[in-house]
Swiss-Prot record:
Keywords: Antibiotic, Antimicrobial, Secreted. Expressed by the venom gland. It comes from Neoponera inversa (Ant). This is U1-poneritoxin-Ni2a. Signal peptide: none annotated. One of its GO terms (cellular component) is extracellular region.
Amino acid sequence: LLKELWKKIKGAGKAVLGKIKGLL
């Protein structure tokens, strides 16, 4: 359960970083 949550958090983090890089 904790690992699945961690995967979702990491996935969301990558998505945010991707959007930031896209804006730059």
